[in-house]
Amino acid sequence: MTDLIPLEQAHCLPRKGSDHKLGEARLAELLPQVPGWELAEAGMAITRTFRFADYYRTLAFVNALAWIAHREDHHPDLGVHYDRVVVRYSTHDVGGLSENDFICAAKVAQLFDQGITA
């Protein structure tokens, strides 16, 4: 699906059941497309920490990220701190990672790279 367009331009699709859980080969293809993100929890999730100058910028990023989550109907786990946000994606309905996690990771990284919160 997302091989033809960049991940940040793709949109999430409903995914339920283990048929949509990504295997090691597909994870190895997708992970390089989201620089800065790391596999976590034995390949069951991806995480990235985003750092900011202050709490205002941190929360501005969280609010912008919330819009992405709402629009894609795919919601991360967040750890919000004064100067950083830890973002974790996993698809509970498939029991691990799905393409939706990588689509949203790319969109969130693009948001950060564009400096929306500066």
Curated annotation (Swiss-Prot):
Pfam families: Pterin_4a (PF01329)
GO annotation (BP), single: tetrahydrobiopterin biosynthetic process
Signal peptide as annotated in the record: none
Keyword terms of this UniProt record: Lyase
Similarity section: Belongs to the pterin-4-alpha-carbinolamine dehydratase family.
CDD domains (UniProt xref): PCD_DCoH_subfamily_a (cd00913)
Top-level taxon: Bacteria
Protein name: Putative pterin-4-alpha-carbinolamine dehydratase
Catalysis: reaction(s): (4aS,6R)-4a-hydroxy-L-erythro-5,6,7,8-tetrahydrobiopterin = (6R)-L-erythro-6,7-dihydrobiopterin + H2O
EC numbers, comma separated: 4.2.1.96
Gene Ontology molecular function: any one: 4-alpha-hydroxytetrahydrobiopterin dehydratase activity
Family annotation (InterPro entries): PCD_sf, Pterin_deHydtase
